[in-house]
Each structure stands twice: as C-alpha cells, then as structure tokens.
C-alpha cells in the first residue's frame, strides 16, 4: 500500500505505524512474529513473498524478485529470509542449492544479523551473473540494517518488476481544468 501511494501521489508524506524504522524495530518484529518479519523484509527490497506470504512449506523459497536481462527475457532471484540469531554458512549453501534447483539467476539472503566471514565466502563462491555487459554478484547477502539504510539488491539495469505500478494521480490543479 505504501509503495502504491508513493507512486500514485509523488511527493506525498504520511506516517506508517507498525512497520520497523530501525534495527531494534526489525528485531522486535522478528521476535514477535517471524512470518511477518519475513513478509516485511521481502517486500521492503521490492520482492514478492512466496505464495503471497501464506504460511506453509516453502522449499527454501521465501520470495521472488523478478527482472529482465539484457535481451528483455524474464529472470528471477530467489529470496531466503533468516530472522533468527543463529545464522550459518550452511544456510547460504542451501540457498545456492535452491538457486541451482530452481534455475534462478540470482539469490538474495536477507538476514536480521550480520553475516559471518564463512557466509560471505560461501556467497562469493556462487560467482557473478552477467548480462549486457553488466556483472552483479549471483548470491547477495543483505542485513536488516543495510535495507533500512536504503541499500537494495544489485539487479542488472536496476530494474525490477515485482509489483504492478500504481497509476499516477493527477494533481488537484489538473482536475480543475
């Protein structure tokens, strides 16, 4: 809703209550409801929650981020979210396996906590995704702190198409004519 309001009414200002604004808020949400944390962080990076955010077996997939390559062919990233305290390189390895199984171009590991050095090594071992002269890490790790600081996944051409765009509303002045 927030994203669509901003698209429809550029320059609009409003407050959203109940959504994390800092790491403490993200941690509180994760402790209270892991599923809501997962939906929040997935949507915040512009991805779609798996099966619309419904609970159930997800086979290691918490969301998808859709984009197009240099040839305008649809591609996707698999999103894996970990909101717990204990995260390991095995979790990144599992995402890499899921990416291969699902033939995903990219993988996004979204976490509440800072990754370990071993996790970063595992992510970098996935290599790079290249299209149209652009090169981005194939498996990317982003923390809640980075996301709250407006850092987003590196996607070729910076273009994602996860959600339908809201139509831009005409200003009040335009309606008077």
Where are these regions (language model features)?
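Mixed-charge (Asp/Glu-Lys/Arg
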Residues: 1-177
């Amino acid at each position: 809703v927030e994203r669509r309001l901003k698209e429809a009414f550029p320059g609009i200002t409003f407050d959203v209550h109940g959504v994390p604004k800092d790491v403490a808020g993200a941690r509180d949400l994760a402790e209270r409801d892991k599923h809501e944390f997962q939906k929040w962080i997935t949507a915040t990076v512009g991805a779609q929650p798996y099966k619309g955010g419904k609970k159930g077996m997800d086979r290691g997939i918490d969301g998808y981020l859709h984009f197009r390559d240099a040839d305008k062919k649809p591609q996707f990233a698999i999103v894996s979210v970990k909101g717990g305290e204990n995260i390991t390189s095995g979790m990144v390895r599992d995402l890499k396996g899921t990416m291969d199984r699902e033939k995903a171009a990219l993988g996004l590991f979204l976490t509440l906590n800072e990754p370990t050095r071993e996790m970063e090594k595992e992510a970098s071992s996935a290599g790079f995704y290249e299209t149209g002269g652009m090169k981005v890490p194939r498996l990317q790790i982003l923390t809640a702190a980075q996301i709250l600081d407006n850092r987003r996944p590196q996607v070729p051409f910076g273009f994602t198409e996860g959600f339908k765009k809201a139509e831009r509303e005409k200003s009040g002045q335009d309606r008077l004519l």
